[in-house]
């Protein structure tokens, strides 16, 4: 298992939910974290934590964040894409704006982030990429097709990172949670909150993946709060 001391993790979506839980866990473990969020004022920077403006839907934002991270920390060892949106977009919606927004933020945002950080991940020889996908990226169980399509795309992106980065020591994992008790599932009424997975559960799994050596790579982690016989 790799020692976190001296390793720098770029983490989007750190202000809330899974991203916030992961940030706190990584800092406690001894990682340095570069947090990217749309409103940097929501977090207070300190020695091990730098806070940067980042909008996953804005072209050029990833490059600015990478530059700020290198200026502050001097290296990038891992990228965790935890930012995402989940408006409703069904197959029958004539207005495709929600589809476009999710494709831009959920699928293209992580791609732009990885591309911007790529040279630094290569340079460290043990680069790590973790993309927060969803069980909706493995099967379709409701009418929010737009969200599922964007998360299926994250699975494809993760596979390409594994293919393109393998010889450089880059390892990538797609983490696919079911319902997690965060504000993104506030609309879910048919599942009691206490039965859902906790953000801290997902954070623990991600930290474990980040610690794995190059000789033990996990392609996908499917995590659910209940038994599901379709997976």
Residues covered by each model-derived region:
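Active-site-adjacent segment of SDR/Rossmann-fold oxidoreductases
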Residues: 139, 160-170
């Amino acid at each position: 298992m790799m020692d976190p001391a001296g390793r720098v993790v770029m983490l989007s979506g750190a202000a809330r939910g899974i991203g916030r839980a992961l940030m706190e866990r990584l800092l406690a473990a001894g990682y340095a974290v570069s947090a990217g969020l749309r409103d940097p004022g929501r977090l207070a920077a300190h020695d091990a934590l730098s806070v940067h403006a980042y909008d996953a839907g804005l072209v050029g934002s990833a490059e600015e964040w990478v530059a700020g991270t290198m200026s502050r920390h001097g290296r990038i060892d891992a990228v965790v894409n935890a930012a995402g949106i989940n408006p409703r977009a069904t197959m029958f919606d004539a207005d495709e704006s929600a589809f476009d927004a999710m494709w831009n933020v959920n699928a293209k945002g992580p791609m732009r982030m990885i591309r911007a950080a790529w040279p630094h991940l290569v340079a460290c020889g043990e680069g790590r990429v973790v993309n927060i996908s969803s069980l909706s990226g493995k099967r379709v169980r409701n009418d929010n097709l737009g969200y599922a399509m964007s998360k299926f795309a994250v699975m494809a992106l993760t596979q390409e990172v594994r293919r393109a980065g393998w010889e450089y020591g880059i390892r990538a994992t797609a983490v696919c949670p079911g319902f997690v008790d965060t504000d993104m599932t506030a609309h879910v009424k048919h599942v009691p909150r206490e039965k859902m997975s906790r953000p801290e559960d997902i954070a623990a799994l991600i930290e474990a993946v980040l610690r794995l050596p190059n000789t033990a790579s996990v392609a996908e982690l499917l995590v659910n709060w209940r038994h599901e016989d379709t997976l």
